[in-house]
Amino acid sequence: MQRLVPTLRRDGVNPELIPVIRTLLAATKEIAFRVRQGALSGVLGSTLDENIQGETQKQLDVIANQLIKDLLLEEPQVRAIASEEEDTVVAGNPKGAYTVAFDPLDGSSNIDINGQIGTIFTIYPARDDVPADSEAQFQQPGHQQVCAGYVLYGPSTILVMTTGGPTRGYTLDATHGSYLLTQAQLSVPLNTQEFALNMANQRFWSAPFQRYVQDLLLGETGPRAKRFNMRWNAAMVGDVHRVLTRGGIFMYPSDNRNPRQPAKLRLLYEANPMAMLTENAGGKAWSENQRILNIQPDSLHQRVAVILGSANEVDVCMSYLLE
């Protein structure tokens, strides 16, 4: 099996980018070990603190964030980092070529129940026209990402990543500590009969989106004339991994629970990297009225609606929303 770095070199990845990726993934190997140890390593439970999102931090949230942050800030090619757990941009080497944003532990509500969790990350070229610690470093549309990926901590530790070409899958060889190429190219089927959605929010959705979901639930007796199954992990990283490996549509639409915050998922370090992975695997990724990768960010922790997955099903969903 091919190791990670030779694969990156074969893909023509910029030599300055490779050490950034390696440094980031070194942190995920340590996180994977802590996750496997669970209660034995004292990482379960919550802290008394909240992050910038107003969410109670889990102990492993804090540990994962610190591991990734510390390693990246030692990497000379990293000019700045942004994290779900950090209020502001953290400056690195002012001469670094790249900026890195990440959700250190997606699905952290699953930690204490031994459910699916993961790390989502994205890498952008650094901007020379703004200071290293400026939010403007990260105010770039998603199509300017040079690398996007996630690590899923499950029965095996899996890395899914793209550097602009195919979306590839790697598996961590725990014996030697290396990520090995196990899926040369993930391909999302055009059609699907599975959807991932938190149905508990149904009463808060727009009328067009509710009609779309209702037609899914009607199955063979409705206008779709086929049966759909629902899957929901309460972790974007797990639900999107299913979509990338066997098809489906993942949806986290806007809702009216809180008019000041109609969307849930963060554009920079959740929606954009997952959109790039999905598109490079042949799927589509939209935010109700536009392609996710075309959105011009206006704030560091900006939230957007997300609809991604099998291309034909995303088109059907969008036809309801844009009618």
Curated annotation (Swiss-Prot):
Keywords in alphabetical order: Carbohydrate metabolism, Cytoplasm, Hydrolase, Magnesium, Metal-binding
SUPFAM superfamilies: Carbohydrate phosphatase (SSF56655)
InterPro entries according to UniProt: FBPase_C_dom (IPR044015), FBPase_class-1 (IPR000146), FBPase_N (IPR033391), FBPtase (IPR028343), Fructose_bisphosphatase_AS (IPR020548)
GO molecular function, one term: magnesium ion binding
One Pfam short name: FBPase_C
EC number assigned by the record: 3.1.3.11
Pathway: Carbohydrate biosynthesis; gluconeogenesis
Enzyme class: hydrolase
GO biological process, one term: gluconeogenesis
Residues that hold Mg(2+) 2 according to the record: 103, 106, 270
Names of required cofactors: Mg(2+)
One GO cellular component term: cytosol
Record's subcellular location: Cytoplasm
Catalytic activity: beta-D-fructose 1,6-bisphosphate + H2O = beta-D-fructose 6-phosphate + phosphate
Cofactor binding mode and count: Binds 2 magnesium ions per subunit.
Binding-site residues for substrate, renumbered to this chain: 106-109, 198, 264
Matching CDD domains: FBPase (cd00354)
Binding site for Mg(2+) 1: 84, 103, 105
Record family assignment: Belongs to the FBPase class 1 family.
Assembly, per entry: Homotetramer.
HAMAP family the UniProt entry points to: FBPase_class1
Protein name as it appears in the record: Fructose-1,6-bisphosphatase class 1
Taxon lineage: Bacteria, Pseudomonadati, Pseudomonadota, Gammaproteobacteria, Cellvibrionales
